[in-house]
């Protein structure tokens, strides 16, 4: 099995290195090939997603991704910015389903910004559609306003749109995920204002007829954002569009104590996927050896489970992470009084020892 390893920018190379060590420590042997992406791709090839990197990603059975982005690239034209690499990979590989688990480990309830009783035992899965919505809708751009109160003034515009096949396929993925968990699915929309999301809601209701054992509910996105803080454990699986999912998944991440703990998977129709931590490249701490590698290590576990059909090995990694937390090891982002603060490499070594 071939894994494309794309470390990227900022803390990406540091955290991916620890995940690779963990994969190498398993009984399985994987063919792993590394390629530049993001700012590293721009520096090497003049583009955030070089042709050879994309070719490797297409040929691989799965992709382990670090993070992209750095302030020094903010002046580049948008198509050349590091963040375009992840958008390009999603588009070219048709990665339409994003899984973002938000799990609060018992040892980390004190690190959450909410009261322990609100987050203890928290286990939410956010299923986000990745290929449609306002992020990719056309037309978009800057122009002279053709009408309205400020006709003739410069305006920026984007297009929110979803096709029926796009909504149906993500709805099926979400219902199937909910069927394997608590059999509760909440579809988050803004159907009271947006035609696109009334359309979304109607299709999700239609798909629900194929999953009678899953309880379907609907919630407007503003209320969902509030309920995630007020009563987060009332959710099991959430399905939503690209932009709403982008925002809500980061909000849910912070309920757990640190976004540095949370993995993610972006899958195609055949479960080939790109696996990455939910956090960004954090250029402010790059090279300092303090980044939390656990989200990336847990992303590698998700890769084993979903794309490589190695659930037993995924369990080993996840159990090792739980053991390390129980032993009191903490990186700076999750440290609490009485725990042992360690750096990136030390945390990786602790997971290896726990394996």
Curated annotation (Swiss-Prot):
Q: Which residues bind NAD(+)?
A: 280-292
The pathway entry for this protein reads as: Amino-acid biosynthesis; L-leucine biosynthesis; L-leucine from 3-methyl-2-oxobutanoate: step 3/4
Q: Which reaction does it catalyse?
A: (2R,3S)-3-isopropylmalate + NAD(+) = 4-methyl-2-oxopentanoate + CO2 + NADH
Q: Which family is annotated?
A: Belongs to the isocitrate and isopropylmalate dehydrogenases family. LeuB type 1 subfamily.
PANTHER family noted in UniProt: 3-ISOPROPYLMALATE DEHYDROGENASE
The record's principal subcellular location, in a coarse class, is cytoplasm
- EC numbers for this chain: 1.1.1.85
Q: How does it assemble?
A: Homodimer.
- Give the SMART domains listed for this entry: Iso_dh
Q: What is the taxonomic lineage of the source species?
A: Bacteria, Pseudomonadati, Pseudomonadota, Betaproteobacteria, Burkholderiales
**Signal peptide as annotated in the record:** none
Instruction: Tell me the HAMAP family matching this sequence.
Output: LeuB_type1
Positions of the site: Important for catalysis?
A: 135, 190
Q: Where do the annotations place substrate binding? A: 90, 100, 128, 222
Q: Which residues form a coiled coil?
A: none
Q: How is the cofactor bound?
A: Binds 1 Mg(2+) or Mn(2+) ion per subunit.
Sorted alphabetically, the keyword list is: Amino-acid biosynthesis, Branched-chain amino acid biosynthesis, Cytoplasm, Leucine biosynthesis, Magnesium, Manganese, Metal-binding, NAD, Oxidoreductase
MF annotations from Gene Ontology:
3-isopropylmalate dehydrogenase activity; magnesium ion binding; NAD binding
The protein in question is named 3-isopropylmalate dehydrogenase
The enzyme class is: oxidoreductase
GO BP annotation list: L-leucine biosynthetic process
What function does the entry list? Catalyzes the oxidation of 3-carboxy-2-hydroxy-4-methylpentanoate (3-isopropylmalate) to 3-carboxy-4-methyl-2-oxopentanoate. The product decarboxylates to 4-methyl-2 oxopentanoate.
* Cofactor entry: Mg(2+); Mn(2+)
Per UniProt, where does Mg(2+) bind? 222, 246, 250
């Amino acid at each position: 099995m071939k894994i494309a390893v794309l470390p990227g920018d900022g803390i990406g190379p540091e955290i991916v290195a620890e995940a690779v060590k963990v994969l190498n420590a398993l009984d399985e042997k994987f063919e792993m090939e590394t390629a530049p992406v993001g700012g590293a791709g721009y520096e090497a090839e003049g583009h955030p997603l070089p042709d050879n990197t994309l070719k490797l990603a297409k040929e691989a059975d799965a992709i382990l991704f670090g993070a992209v982005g750095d302030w020094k690239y903010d002046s580049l034209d948008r198509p050349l910015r590091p963040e375009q690499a992840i958008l390009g990979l999603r588009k070219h590989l048709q990665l339409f389903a994003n899984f973002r688990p938000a799990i609060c480990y018992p040892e980390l309830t004190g690190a959450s910004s909410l009261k322990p009783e609100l987050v203890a035992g928290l286990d939410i899965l956010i299923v986000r559609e990745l290929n449609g919505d306002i992020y990719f809708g056309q037309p978009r751009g800057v122009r002279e306003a053709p009408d309205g109160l400020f006709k003739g003034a410069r305006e920026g515009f984007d297009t929110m749109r979803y096709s029926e096949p796009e909504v149906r396929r993500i709805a099926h993925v979400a219902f199937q995920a909910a069927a394997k968990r608590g059999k509760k699915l909440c579809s988050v929309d803004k159907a009271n204002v947006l035609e696109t999301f009334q359309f979304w809601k109607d299709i999700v209701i239609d798909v629900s007829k194929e999953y009678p054992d899953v309880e379907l509910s609907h919630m407007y996105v503003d209320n969902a954002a509030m309920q995630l803080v007020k009563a987060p454990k009332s959710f099991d699986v959430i399905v939503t569009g690209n932009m709403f999912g982008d925002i809500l998944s980061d909000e849910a991440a912070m309920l757990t104590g640190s976004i540095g703990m949370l993995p993610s998977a972006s899958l195609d129709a055949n479960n080939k996927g790109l696996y990455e931590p939910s956090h960004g490249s954090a250029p402010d701490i790059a090279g300092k050896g303090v980044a939390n590698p656990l989200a990336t290590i847990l992303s590698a576990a998700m890769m084993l489970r979903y794309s490589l059909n190695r659930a037993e090995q995924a369990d080993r990694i996840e159990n090792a992470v739980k053991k390390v937390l129980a032993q009191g090891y903490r990186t700076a982002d999750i440290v609490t009084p009485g725990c042992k603060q360690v750096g990136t490499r030390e945390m990786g070594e602790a997971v290896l020892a726990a394996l």
